[in-house]
């Protein structure tokens, strides 16, 4: 049951602000994106800026390769073949440009199943 673009737009026009807010949150969670506009940051002369975007890198799968592949699929949304290739070719970046909290969550999930992970 595929919807065409006109039907989707009509549904969005009829939705309340609360429903649209829920839709945005669901899209952000489903696709791992954010609806926030990029903020231009003026370069400060002296101090080093705090890092806000992180890369989660799988260093190695450890002993539980199958469990690591399952978690990689869950985190990235990749298919079985792609997730296996990523794990086999470690070290590889799993997620780039993620918030510190999300990076730490991903690291914890992978380390829980025996993988070696770095957050950069």
Swiss-Prot record:
Keywords: Ribonucleoprotein, Ribosomal protein
Listed PANTHER family: 39S RIBOSOMAL PROTEIN L12 (PTHR45987), LARGE RIBOSOMAL SUBUNIT PROTEIN BL12M (PTHR45987:SF4)
Record keyword Ribonucleoprotein present: yes
GO process annotations (BP): translation
Family: Belongs to the bacterial ribosomal protein bL12 family.
This protein's record includes keyword Translocase: no
Molecular function GO terms recorded: mRNA binding; structural constituent of ribosome
Subunit structure as annotated in this protein's UniProt entry: Homodimer. Part of the ribosomal stalk of the 50S ribosomal subunit. Forms a multimeric L10(L12)X complex, where L10 forms an elongated spine to which 2 to 4 L12 dimers bind in a sequential fashion. Binds GTP-bound translation factors.
Protein name: Large ribosomal subunit protein bL12
Function as written in the Swiss-Prot or TrEMBL entry: Forms part of the ribosomal stalk which helps the ribosome interact with GTP-bound translation factors. Is thus essential for accurate translation.
This protein's GO CC annotations: cytosolic large ribosomal subunit
SUPFAM superfamilies to which the protein is assigned, alphabetical: ClpS-like, Ribosomal protein L7/12, oligomerisation (N-terminal) domain
Organism domain of life: Bacteria
Pfam families: Ribosomal_L12 (PF00542), Ribosomal_L12_N (PF16320)
InterPro entries, per database record: Ribosomal_bL12, Ribosomal_bL12_C, Ribosomal_bL12_C/ClpS-like, Ribosomal_bL12_oligo, Ribosomal_bL12_oligo_N_sf
